């Protein structure tokens, strides 16, 4: 099997993990009804997953740093499958929380390991595209996994979704066992030493790009549906189609980000993508009550926002190459924190200012990310910058 197909297998695994994380938002009403809890209590399942994912991933990656990446993938995927099995067979809210915690612990390690393996087995000069493919699998869960999961839940009950994910996860474990090569781990790095990485200016600045880019995106995206309905005046019957197109644009943007990184380098792709991100957020607040105009801007926004994902992953992997796995795991945690903080800040502005303000607040966050990017690139020696471009 070619390495290209192996990378696609990793993308499929990433898709399963993403679906398991995001599916809750698509079946929240069914979970609340079946378990006899409020929607707010059901919503905590999302918060718990994100926090466990963010906090446990760096710790687990540090403890398993020297382990063969294929073996680590098998163990982490096994833990993830076990969590989904528990969600499928055990009754009650408390047991479901426990299952979500186990899922999240496995999920974080699976995604980071998939990104690491993809970068290591990719052909020279194609690492950015390889990472983009894995990221695209995770992104696809929003567009395909959540709607498909909703359909399965309506037909067979919401627990069947987790049973299906567990079954597909088991199949993925078998395929990975027979196809992925032995891949060396990184040099073990104690957790305190990982945290000490924040003392390095380029690492702290690099991770701040993730926080402000995705945080700015989250401010607006979290409240996109009510924004389109109440501010842009889009008909509710058309909303699902608009969101589907938005999701497809994110897939295209993610793939383009990897291609652009390989062809034109990190600085051009990162700064260019985030600049377009800001422009589209501002335009979205100016172009209202025009269905075609709003749709075009949404497509460009989604494309620009997600072109940054694989580029930033590759950028972090090149900042400290010998600790790429550690940095990628820290980045996964930062992404989870950014989404949570962005949603929280967006809620504050929606409640105390206006729904229309979220695009401007989101644009401000992305602007800070651009400034951090420019500071990093301008401080690098020309040769180091050339290395990043390759």
UniProtKB/Swiss-Prot annotation:
Respond yes or no to whether keyword Transmembrane is given for this record.
yes
Subcellular location field: Cell membrane
Q: What is its main location?
A: membrane
Which Pfam families does this entry report, sorted A to Z?
A: MFS_1 (PF07690)
Gene3D superfamilies, per the entry: MFS general substrate transporter like domains
Taxonomy, superkingdom: Bacteria
Would the keyword Membrane be found if you checked this record's keyword annotation?
yes
The similarity comment for this entry is: Belongs to the major facilitator superfamily.
Listed PANTHER family: PURINE EFFLUX PUMP PBUE (PTHR43124:SF10)
**Descriptive protein name:** Uncharacterized MFS-type transporter YbcL
Q: Identify the species of origin.
A: Bacillus subtilis (strain 168)
**What gene is it encoded by?**
ybcL
